[in-house]
Amino acid sequence: MAREKQIIECVPNFSEGRNKDVIKQITDEVESVKGVKLLDVDPGEATNRTVVTFVGEPSVVVEAAFRCVKKAAQLIDMRQHHGAHPRMGATDVCPLIPVAGITLEECAVLARQLAERIANELQVPCYCYEAAAKTPERKNLAICRKGEYEGLPQRMTEAAEAPDYGARDWDEQLARTGCTAVGARDFLIATNFNLNTTSTRRANAIAFDVREKGRPMREGGSPIGKPMKDEKGEVIMQPGTLKATKAIGWFIDEYGIAQVSMNITDINITPLHVAFDEVCRCAQNRGIRVTGTEIVGLIPKRTLLEAGTYFLKKQQRSTGIPEEDIIKIAIMSMGLDDLKPFNPREKVIEYLLEDTDKTPKLIDLTVKEFANETSRESPAPGGGTISAYMGALGAALGTMVANLSSHKAGWDARWEEFSNWAEKGQAIQAELMVLVDEDTEAFNRIMSAFGLPKGTDEEKAARSQAIQEATLFATEVPLHTMKASYKVFELCRAMAEEGNPNSVSDAGVGVLAARAAVLGAGLNVKINASGLKDKETAARLVAEANELIEKANEAEAEIMKIVEAKL
């Protein structure tokens, strides 16, 4: 299966919030890195601090982070800095945050690598915090920033206070730049739950019910009783029901309603939909209704997909439906458009990145445009691309039968069985849709390699190697298409045997499409493998393709017998 694209977010805080020219020069460094999307620049006058947010694939985000830290070190003199916010360097903090396809632990590794590079190349000492911390106590940013900038000269002389990377004596350069804290943390979601009340007190009561910190325990259990204290004289708290959350209640003049305002600090512990349901429950206990949800800032796509899937399962409806449909369910279920229209293309990080990438894709064409593009006097898109699309259509047909079966009257007890098949079908379809464009890209790589200069012996050698690498890639892509398309047979066999009998012909067409995809992609494996100088590799790839062709022919014959018997 095609691996989910890795995306991370970086939110560096720079110790300059007043000089717009300096801020612009720093953010220009971010935008100079191809593949990075600058999402937000938030300068603060009183804090004299600017929070910058950008996203992209890990390698380019880390590069952009390094460049903006470098520019900040050149432009900001900490000896002249004064502001209301704690700080210890020109770049005060630089956290990396997982968004999609990557774990917090992997981000922590990247953060340490970034910290080491900053220390080695820029001579800016770095402390690692939160998930990137090298010692338990340094997970706390406040420990890393102890004494702030003014305390650094003393800390640089103490072994226990030495930075994780770049320990050095205090000098004029270090006095200018200060130190930087580089870390990795989970994605934070800021959200407000809309209430059908104007009472801030009741909104606060709901917030205290759910937030992890909870509320003070009071004598007699009365809301006006004195707070109870432990033997140390500290107020005893009664924890709320939602871990990894902070919340308060407030009234918003703009909307004329009260809200429960919440920060979810770890969406793996408390996903948005879980928070929504719990706030609804606690509100209902107090005679109040949640009318909708307001998302502040941006969110990862998985937040909406998990929510939509959750609400579909509550309805006992198939979850093997297109991504857009799942997100629509999430929007409706949590009332994300209660106060104003909610556009996923403007609120979901992955979609913003997609819209930034202007590379034209075949899968974005209409059916007519795709057919016309294929018919034109150009070798790509060609048979490999069409094979991948045939496989995707086969998977789509099998998935359609699964969804029809999941919702068939009288089959309610089997909804989950067919929903699971539909999910598998959607995954196969998504994998093959990626290969539609990847096959054309593979051909274009070969053409680009043949276009390389060949004037000198070095150029000839480099060109020859590039051609072989591109040819190998162009052989492996259709082989991937064959493997993905072959998985369609299992889906369509199950639907032919167990699915809605009224749709058995659709399962049959899915089988025929899958066979065409496997055999068609096999032709591409063979013709491209013939261009490989490594004949051992070529023979191995062709043998693998021939095996898949044989298995596809057998599977098609077996399943079509089942289909024909039910017509």
What residue spans do the PLM features occupy?
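Long, contiguous binding/interaction regions
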Residues: 2-369, 376-377, 454, 459-462, ...
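Conserved phosphate/anionic-ligand binding catalytic regions in large, soluble enzymes, centered on
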Residues: 10-12, 16, 88-95, 266, ...
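Amphipathic, well-ordered alpha-helical segments in soluble domains
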Residues: 68, 370, 396-400, 442, ...
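Preference for long, well-ordered alpha-helical segments
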Residues: 114, 124-128, 137-140, 488, ...
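Amphipathic alpha-helical interface segments
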Residues: 187-189, 439-512, 516, 528
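Polytopic transmembrane helical bundles with strong interfacial aromatic enrichment
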Residues: 357-366, 372, 480, 484-487, ...
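Amphipathic alpha-helix face/heptad-repeat signature
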Residues: 389-393, 421, 428-435, 474-484, ...
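A structural-propensity feature for long, helix-poor, extended segments
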Residues: 407-453, 548-557
